[in-house]
Design a protein with these regions (language model features):
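An N-cap/entry alpha-helix motif that binds or orients negatively charged groups
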Residues: 1-62
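Acidic (Asp/Glu)-rich catalytic clusters
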Residues: 57-61, 109-116, 137-143, 203-206
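Active-site cofactor/substrate anionic-group-binding motifs, chiefly glycine-
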Residues: 57-105
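Charged helix-capping and loop-helix junction motifs
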Residues: 82-86, 224-230, 283
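A gly/proline- and charged-residue-enriched helix-loop-helix capping module
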Residues: 89-129
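Alpha/beta enzyme core
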Residues: 90, 94, 127-246, 252-274, ...
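Short beta-alpha connecting loops at secondary-structure transitions
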Residues: 273-283
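Charged C-terminal helix
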Residues: 293-317
C-alpha cells in the first residue's frame, strides 16, 4: 500500500499548530524543562576565544550543530500562499544548516527537496513496510542526504498501535530495522531513542545516527533526553554513530547543555515554530541567529573553542 496523495487527513487548523503540553505529572515535557533549567555551568574564561560553530554531519560541513526539526504537515494551514515546510527548508539552506522533514507524501516532500537544502527524511513506522521502503527509495532518487524512522511512534493513547492520517503504525523489531537499513545506501537514522538498550540495538542494526528524543512527550513520564544522553554516549563509545537530540530546546543555552552532555547536534522545533508561522523563512533565520549567539556566548564563557571539544565537567546538576 503506497501513501495516497489524496488521503484525507485530520488537521486541527492554525490554532492547533503550536504544541501545548498538558502540564500534568505524566507530561514528559514538564520534566524535560525542569531538568534543563537545573543544569548549571562553571566559568572558564582564561584563554577563552570566540568559538567555531562549524559541524560535520554525514561527511558534510554545516555552519552550526543546531539543526531544523522534522516537522510534518505544516503546509495544511488555511493560507494556501504560505508553505511553511518550504520556508524553513529555505532558512536551512540560507544558514547552511541540516534540514529535517517528517511525515509528508512524496509530492510534498519533493517540493521541499526542490528548495535544495540538505535534508533528512524521517518516515513513520508504517505497519505496511512497503510504504517505508517506497519512501526511502523516493528520498534516494530525489537527493535526500539521509533517511530514518520515528521508531517511537508506535503506541497510541488507546494502548493500541497508533493510526496516523488513516495509516496504521506497527512495531519495528531489530530484525525489521536491520532489513530496512540494508535497503538503502543513505545514512539511516533511528529517531526516538531514549535508552541505552535502544541505542545499542540501533547501532547493531547499522544505523549511522540516532536522535535521543521523547518526541514531544509521546511517552508518559519519559526521562529527559538530556538525562539519557551521557549514558547513551558512553554506551556507543568507539562506534561511528552520530548522536543527535531534541525536545524542548528553546535557546542556544539549551542547545549548549545537550551538546556538552553528548549530542553531536540538536534539532529545534517549538523555538522556531511561532516565528515560522508568523514570518516564514525570515522569522526562522532571526530565531536561529539568536540561538547561535547564545550558543557562542556560553561556549566562550566556558572556554570551548569548537564543537569537537565540549567538556562535560563544566556542567553541575
Amino acid at each position: 500500500m503506497i501513501m495516497d496523495n489524496q488521503a484525507k487527513q485530520q488537521w486541527p487548523g492554525p490554532a492547533g499548530l503550536i504544541p501545548v503540553t498538558s502540564g500534568k505529572a505524566e507530561d514528559a515535557n514538564i520534566h524535560n524543562r525542569n531538568f534543563l533549567d537545573h543544569i548549571l555551568v562553571e566559568m572558564r574564561v582564561i584563554d577563552a576565544t570566540e568559538p567555531d560553530l562549524t559541524t560535520e554531519i554525514f561527511g558534510q560541513k554545516f555552519s552550526s550543530p543546531i539543526m531544523m526539526p522534522a516537522f510534518s504537515h505544516l503546509n495544511k494551514i488555511k493560507n494556501k500562499d504560505v508553505k511553511p515546510m518550504e520556508e524553513y527548508a529555505m532558512a536551512a539552506k540560507e544558514e547552511n544548516l541540516l534540514n529535517w522533514v517528517g511525515m509528508e507524501n512524496d509530492d510534498d516532500f519533493g517540493n521541499i527537496l526542490a528548495v535544495n537544502s540538505k535534508t533528512v527524511r524521517i518516515i513513520k513506522p508504517f505497519a505496511d513496510h512497503d510504504i517505508i521502503l517506497h519512501q526511502i527509495a523516493f528520498a534516494e532518487q530525489h537527493g535526500a542526504i539521509a533517511v530514518g524512522i520515528d521508531i517511537d511512534h508506535i503506541a497510541g493513547t488507546n494502548g493500541k498501535y497508533d493510526v496516523v492520517d488513516g495509516y496504521p503504525m506497527g512495531p519495528i523489531t531489530l530484525k525489521d530495522l536491520k532489513t530496512i537499513v540494508e535497503k538503502t545506501h543513505l545514512p539511516f537514522v533511528a529517531k526516538g531513542v531514549l535508552s541505552v538498550s535502544d541505542a545499542l540495538k540501533a547501532c547493531e542494526a547499522g544505523c549511522k545516527a540516532i536522535v535521543v528524543s521523547h518526541h514531544h512527550g509521546r511517552i508518559p513520564f519519559g526521562i529527559p533526553p538530556a538525562y539519557a544522553l551521557p549514558k547513551i554516549k558512553d554506551a556507543l563509545a568507539g562506534s561511528d554513530i552520530k548522536i543527535f537530540a531534541d525536545c524542548g530546546i528553546e535557546s542556544g543555552y539549551d542547545a549548549y547543555k545537550l551538546l556538552v552532555l553528548g549530542a553531536d547536534a540538536v534539532s529545534v522545533g517549538r523555538a522556531i515554530l511561532s516565528p515560522l508561522l508568523k514570518e516564514g523563512k525570515n522569522g526562522v533565520i532571526k530565531q536561529i541567529k539568536k540561538m547561535h549567539a547564545e550558543l557562542s556566548e556560553l561556549m566562550m564563557y566556558t572556554g570551548i573553542k569548537d564543537t569537537r571539544t565540549f567538556d562535560a565537567n563544566i556542567l553541575h546538576y
